């Protein structure tokens, strides 16, 4: 049985969801919402794996570490780093823009690093650091929101 060709870029066409009204903007149609969710999910996972890679590298190259723990830390660092790049590339393919994916990964990496630093090393972050995280979160909220255009198209002149 032959499969029907889809639209370019892996986008979901309106014919795939006939119950979606055509007047909905593209970012609110059924397939676009699903793609956005998976884009954000993959970017959050990429940030968490990046923080885990950094934490395992810090454990592996500590001053009082045995050779076996050092080798284990390097293996964990390499595997989590490859998982981070895999999830980041998948997040890029699902996201609406590379800026959204990059900022989402950065935010996830910062929060995951703070959590792992607290759990593994007892590190606490200062108020200024949390203020920076809040500003990044505000920026993320702004770029993930998609407002409808407020301008109306001009009527075409007939010659």
Swiss-Prot record:
GO cellular component, one term: membrane
Keywords: Membrane, Transmembrane, Transmembrane helix
Recorded superkingdom: Eukaryota
The keyword Transmembrane helix appears for this protein: yes
tRNA processing listed as a keyword: no
Entry-linked SUPFAM superfamilies: Multidrug resistance efflux transporter EmrE
Topological type in the membrane: Multi-pass membrane protein
Primary location recorded for the protein, binned into one broad class: membrane
Compartments it resides in: Membrane
Transmembrane parts of this sequence: 37-57, 59-79, 100-120, 124-144
Protein name in UniProt: Transmembrane protein 42
Native source species: Homo sapiens (Human)
